[in-house]
Structures are given as C-alpha cells and as structure tokens.
C-alpha cells in the first residue's frame, strides 16, 4: 500500500473503514470481470521532471515523489471545490503548497503551473500502474481507457510505454476513448458508452472504473452504471462513500 493509511478494497469489493460497508456500489459477490481506467493521475502524471525544476525556482521541492504526492493533493482540492474539468485553480494552489513553494510566491507559481501544465505534459508513466496493467493482461482481464483529454492521449500512452489500443509492444486496451475525439466528456455518462461497446460480454455493474477525481470519475462512472474506484494513494478521502485503492496493484484481488 502506497502512502500508508489508505483503506484498501476488501475482496468482497467494498471499502470498509471501521468495518462498515460503504456506498451504493455493491455487487453481491464482489467479483468484477473487466476494468476501465482514467489516464491522467491513474496511468500517467504531469511530468515531474519538468515541473520539479520549474517550481524549484520558487522554493519548491524538485523531488519526484513530492510531485507525485502534489498531484493527488491537487485533485483532492479540486474535488472539494466541486471544480469543473476546465477549472484548475484549486488544483494549482494545492499543488504548489504541497511541494512547499515559498508562501509569498504561491500565487505566481500556481499561475505559472497553470500555463505550463499542457495536455502533452501528462506523460510520466506511473511505475506501479504499468506493472499492474501487465499483470492484469497476463490474467486475460479485458481493459480499456476512458479519458478527458485533448486528442493526444492514445499517442501519449503508447509513447510512454503504458498501453495502446489493440495489440502492440505494450499492454493492449480494447479501446482508448479520448473526450476530444468522441465529443463528450466525464462526468457525462455517455462517454463510457464508447468503451462499453467494446465490452459487450460484461454487465456494466461488473466493470470497474478507476479514476482520481470524485467529480469526474466517481460521479460519471456511477451514472453510467459502472463500479467506481478512486485511486487515493495518500488517503485524501477518508470519509468516502466509494471504494478506494492506493495502487492499481490492489485490483488483482477484486477480479474473478
């Protein structure tokens, strides 16, 4: 478990802080048959080898692990603010605070972060996520990606050595759905329909959707009839009414 203290998914598919079953997303036998993934924050992160030196000029840490943590701090702040997909103000401020930018420079650093974090920068492959995808592929688990993106995500995932749509050098996804390409974005449940068409043999309630946003991913997956799982490696959502994991490596125990 990454970032200790995160409540992992029990083998019956439910998050059990304090021993209590949570949420409306239960499946009676707790076994799932396929997985859909968000891309940003789940498979790749904004490249810390770029953002580290950038924010170090404002007193921030350049350590990769600190920037990994900062992304999830930013996403938690974004979710608390119920911010839309296009509103990254709360994320930017939480990010620069998390990497310990000098307090009197945080507003300008957040603005610079906002102008630097382009779609193409979401390219740093999360090592344990890559390992998890390979393990799931070896088991024959059907997988796809559903991402709010800008037309670039299929190329980025392939170029970063994470996965590709169909057979190839890396892990095969049945489809990589990019919101810019299909014209609909999370939390609109219609975006998941493009992936579900590629998983016709599986009841949607037995498909996991793993994301890093409460507003976009958990809400969108629920509306589409999928079982949402939040990647929450630093226990930023202790009062969640949905399932959480600290790493994609924890998915193995949920799949039949």
Language model features by range: what are they?
Residues 1-37, 103, 130-137, 141-256:
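Asp-based, Mg2+/Mn2+-dependent phosphohydrolase catalytic module
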Residues 19-134, 138-142, 155:
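N-terminal helical cap/lid subdomain that shapes the substrate entry/recognition surface
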């Amino acid at each position: 478990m990454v970032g200790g203290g995160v409540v992992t998914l029990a083998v019956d598919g439910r998050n059990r802080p304090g021993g209590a079953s949570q949420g409306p997303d239960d499946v009676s036998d707790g076994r799932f048959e396929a997985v859909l993934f968000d891309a940003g924050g789940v498979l790749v992160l904004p490249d810390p080898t770029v953002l580290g030196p950038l924010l170090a000029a404002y007193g921030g840490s350049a350590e990769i692990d600190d920037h990994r943590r900062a992304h999830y701090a930013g996403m938690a702040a974004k979710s608390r603010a119920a911010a839309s997909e296009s509103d990254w103000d709360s994320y930017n401020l939480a990010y620069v605070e998390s990497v310990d930018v000098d307090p009197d420079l945080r507003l300008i650093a957040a603005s610079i972060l906002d102008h630097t974090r382009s779609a193409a920068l979401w390219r740093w492959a999360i090592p344990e996520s890559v390992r998890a995808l390979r393990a799931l592929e070896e088991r024959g688990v059907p997988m796809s990606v559903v991402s709010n993106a800008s037309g670039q995500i299929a190329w980025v995932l392939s170029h970063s050595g994470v996965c590709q749509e169909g057979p190839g050098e890396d892990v095969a996804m049945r489809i990589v759905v990019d919101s810019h390409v299909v014209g609909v974005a999370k939390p609109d449940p219609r975006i998941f329909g493009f992936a579900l068409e590629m998983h016709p043999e599986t009841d949607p309630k037995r498909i996991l959707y793993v994301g890093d946003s409460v507003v976009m991913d958990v809400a969108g997956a629920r509306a589409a009839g999928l079982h949402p799982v939040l990647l929450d490696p630093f226990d930023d959502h202790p009062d969640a009414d949905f399932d959480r994991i600290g790493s994609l490596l924890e998915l193995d125990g949920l799949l039949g």
